[in-house]
Amino acid sequence: MSIITSPKLKSDIDPQWFEQDYWVNQGRLLGANCGRGSTWTIKSEWGKWVLRHYFRGGFYAKLNRDRYFWLGLKNSRAYKEYQLLDEIQRLNLPSPKPIAALIVKHGLFYRNDLIMEHIQHQMTFAQGIKNQYLPNDPSRDKKQLDLKYWHQIGQTIAQYHHNGIYHSDLNAHNVLLNHDQVFIIDFDKGAIKPPNQHWQQNNISRLKRSIEKVSQKSCDDQLSEQWQILLEGYHV
């Protein structure tokens, strides 16, 4: 078992923190979001955190839900995401602060978890798009997606790209909006790469496809105008 954290927290980290049941029994489990990687919002003594357990997706999930082939500690998913988030914090870019990662080896395989800071936010970019374009969607609420956010999102992505931060799944669900702030989350499989127009454009194109999927519109004049505002922010 390996725990990755800052030297300041090393003596304080309890392996039980990586177990959902621990927080349930403490009455400190605040919520859950179960996608491919299940995450739980928890209330620690130091504030709100997010606990993430890494699950497989696609075909391999049918064979093995959460075990990965062991290729060394530094190649484990949680280790790499922790280190990337730590570097992003050093660059002062808007993302969750990593708290600790747990990697447990079982023979030829391992499972892993990550604890990170909870980002206070009003809505995701995806929720804002739904609120605007899908009036009959049951998950729609009254929060409005201000035009300023499109420009800010473009600027924020540009800051990441300028520093060579590659996001493997840049989509509208992984962008959080809070008043005048834009945060990007979920850096699993992310990396630091030499800035390159090819992967950067692929990132932008992936986000555009996500926006079209969430809004259920691909040839809409208003959406096209808003997308141009995002690109203007990106190219400032």
Language model features by range: what are they?
Residues F18-F125, A158, H162:
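Conserved ATP-binding subdomain of kinase catalytic cores across diverse folds
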Residues G164, D169:
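Conserved catalytic-loop position in the HRD/HxD motif
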Residues T124-S139:
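AlphaC helix of the protein kinase catalytic domain
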Residues L170-L177:
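Hydrophobic residue at the +6 position relative to the catalytic HRD Asp in the kinase catalytic loop
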Residues D141, V182-V236:
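C-lobe/activation-segment region of protein kinase-like
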Residues Q120, A172, K189-A191:
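Short, glycine/acidic-enriched loop or turn micro-motifs at the edges of active sites
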Residues L145-T156:
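Conserved alphaE helix
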Residues M1-Q16, W23, P96:
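Broad phosphate/nucleotide-binding scaffolds in NTP-utilizing and phosphate-metabolizing enzymes
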